[in-house]
Amino acid sequence: MPTAVNVAKQCLTAEASYALEEAVNVARRRGHSQTTSLHAISALLSLPTSVLRDACARVRNSAYSPRLQFKALDLCLSVSLDRIQSGHQLGSDDSPPVSNSLMAAIKRSQAHQRRLPENFRIYQEMSQSQNQNSLSCVKVELRQLILSILDDPVVSRVFGEAGFRSSELKLSIIRPVPHLLRYSSQQPLFLCNLTGNPEPNPVRWGFTVPSLNFNGDLDYRRISAVFTKDKGRNPLLVGVSAYGVLTSYLNSLEKNQTDGMILPTKLHGLTAVNIGSEISDQISVKFDKTYTDTRFHDLGKLAEQGSGPGLLLHYGDLRVFTNGEGNVPAANYIVNRISELLRRHGRRVWLIGATTSNEVYEKMMRRFPNVEKDWDLQLLTITSLKPCLPHNKSSLIGSFVPFGGFFSTTPSELKLPFSGFKTEITGPVSSISDQTQSTLPPWLQMTTRTDLNQKSSAKVVQTKEGLESVCGNKFTSSASASTCSAKSVTTDLNLRVSSVTTGSGLKKHLDSKDFSQPQSVSSYSFDNPRDLNAESFKIIYRRLTDMVSGQDEAARVISCALSQPPKSVTRRDVWLNLVGPDTVGKRRMSLVLAEIVYQSEHRFMAVDLGAAEQGMGGCDDPMRLRGKTMVDHIFEVMCRNPFCVVFLENIEKADEKLQMSLSKAIETGKFMDSHGREVGIGNTIFVMTSSSQGSATTTSYSEEKLLRVKGRQVEIRIETVSSLPMVRSVYGPTSVNKRKLMGLGNLQETKDTVESVKRLNRTTNGVLDLNLPAQETEIEEKYHCEENSNVWLMNLKNHKRLIEVPFKPFDFEGLAEKIKKSVKENFDKCVRSDCLLEVDPKIIERLLAAVYFSDSRKDIKELLENIMSPVFLRIKERYEITTSCVVKLVGRDLDIFLEDQMDLFFVKSQ
């Protein structure tokens, strides 16, 4: 039977009574006969200082905006209230009585409040004094009333439909986060979320209690103690804050800080190596067996030859190995390689990892039954609620633009092994491009830093002057002034403040770093993202010139663009326009750029807009483009992988939708798809190329010509001639290009003529359209379309954010001469050196294409030796070559295309 409102109020405090009165008003306005728990929830959410709404804001799903999820909650609540049947009309003085479910919630809260430890003594004294009236009328506080109402199944269903969990809300109300530790942009940590996170590296900002001690000395001692054991020497951290403890431990280990973690003496100098990010890429993105073998081979060499007690490998989260969406064979292979590494190098290799739940560990054991024994694992439970938020970390990426030092941390998947653990674990990424300074919370508004002293300021100025001399352009006055500014705002993607190292830290880094020592990988890690822009330039420039020869000027411009600080805090995207010939060099340099900045070649997306216009796919994976427009394909890839290099080839062929999206992206920092959805590009590098104009100099070789013959197999026919005066050696610079052997040149000319006649006949035999005005209209529309495209392209190229990178024509003639000399040397080595060799230009052309399209144009001698040595060995076996012989290699095209360059030539039988 319903309870009168006045009777129910006797059980509540003043604050709770006010909330109940508001719930009664909601029921009266809707014409309902009783006041239910849903009316109470509606009233509680509407209070000026709503504890329930504040709890919802902290446990909301970070995948949706707060406004969207609260609108969903209001909608679900309104629908549930509308389903309640209206009762008879009540008078103006009548109030809808409290329903049985709501009164039961009040009784439950009374009983729970009576059992609280802080209230137990008071109610015990009441019971001893036999004051039953006082005992029965326990005043229920508002917080306890909310907790009891959340237990109502109807209320739980409403919150569940809006994406909330009653258990999370209750825990959030019981343990409110203090103001100084509250991060409104992140989802708090709850035990019920631990097993439901599909991400490979679930990282959350801690839901903390102010009275807890965050000192990790005990956890550090426990981890170090496991390393010293003879059995079970590789710890696996399991717990809510396992990632935070692991990151702090490895940071201290990397900085050689033994205070607070009691590192044993025999472990001093232990080298920490991070392979977790690469394991995740190989299993979840794309598996490369050759790359994996090379990496583990390097790890083995580092374990054997490295100084100190050995190597500590951080393999990341066990969830990567057990995730059903990953590559299962790749996971099996990597697990076996880690086991093999431990067997080979014994006591010089340690392992460490972390996971948030024991269920993941059990799943790992079911999939790999021997891994606990092979890896010598020791479970280490982490019970302290250490914040998962690491301190300000940095890496080489921080010294690059598009980031320009504004990253305090980077996602773990962007880190290569051997680079340290400074930025391994961060919170979820959220864009700040559409936020202003005035709307930011107080802890994001400004952060002060210590003024630079005179000595440190001079050191910073000297570093900048060195960069100016290398790049050939000057810093603006505002950039120079910002060096000595008293305040600086450095907000990273996780909406947290990162401190800026002063000049003293820069000088310390300069004095301590020794870049002359050989490195195991081609990347470095700095102590601060703003350190050594000049050194960053050298690293980028060296990598680019090593991988792409003959384009030093282009490498210089790109290195300058990536080394300079960004003009805006919220815009770290870079736009490059590669102009000139050498299409292969442009693509290869962009790929190397992805490897340098994002530490992975899988973060490179290439789109050939010219091929897409002709209906030939235009991307590396044509199946993904099926049924989609090009702009939607690019948008999807950027949503899935915002840290990437987008390579747009033949940009002048872009359609109208892509033109609009690119124009908006370069202006606003948001890339839009065909449906109007947007994605931030603050961490993306756009590289655009256009079809190169024909150069004034005429050469025997061109990119188009080599592209047509790429991979086509050639049949080699050997002719031996004894007449010495009639032959020329391949050593002569003009002997190959000015001869036509066996009438092959005339045959090719005849074939081209026949094709021209066929095309002419097909054109003239078609049915003519006599509707001349329609034809003129089509021509006019096409002309206007091309004109608009040219205007758009001109405006894009003139944009201030777009950096023009000049490329020089590739020296095909010089490379051809090197190939001829290398072929002759190889022939002398395999056959004999006292006879002459004459090679068909067709064969030289195939070799030139093989070298030009290879991964490295510098290893010409080794590449040609692998291709031509089998050919010359067959010649030596099948023919009797004497001193007076002249060996002629005559080529004939076959309609066979091969990916393997080693089988490029087929030697015809005698």
UniProtKB/Swiss-Prot annotation:
Gene Ontology biological process terms, A to Z: response to strigolactone
GO molecular function: ATP binding; ATP hydrolysis activity
Primary localization class, coarse: nucleus
Modification(s) after translation: Ubiquitinated upon strigolactone treatment. Probable proteolytic target of SCF(MAX2)-mediated stigolactone signaling.
Localization, UniProt: Nucleus
Observed phenotype of the null mutant: No visible phenotype. Suppresses max2 phenotypes associated with strigolactone-D14-regulated growth. Smxl8 and max2 double mutants have branching and inflorescence heights similar to max2 mutants.
Gene3D superfamilies: Clp, N-terminal domain (1.10.1780.10), P-loop containing nucleotide triphosphate hydrolases (3.40.50.300)
Chain segments carrying region Disordered: 504-524
UniProt KW keywords: Nucleus, Repeat, Transcription, Transcription regulation, Ubl conjugation
One cellular component (GO) term of this entry: nucleus
Region listing for Repeat 2, in residue ranges: 98-179
Described function: Probable component of a transcriptional corepressor complex involved in branching control. Regulates cotyledon expansion and lateral root growth, but not germination or hypocotyl elongation. Promotes auxin transport and PIN1 accumulation in the stem and represses BRC1/TCP18 expression in axillary buds.
Domain description: Contains 1 EAR motif required for the interaction with TPR2.
Subunit structure: Interacts with TPL/TPR in an EAR-motif dependent manner. Interacts with MAX2 and TPR2. Interacts with D14. The interaction with D14 occurs in the presence of (2'R) stereoisomers of strigolactones, but not (2'S) stereoisomers.
Protein name stated in the entry: Protein SMAX1-LIKE 8
Lineage: Eukaryota, Viridiplantae, Streptophyta, Embryophyta, Tracheophyta
Gene designation: SMXL8
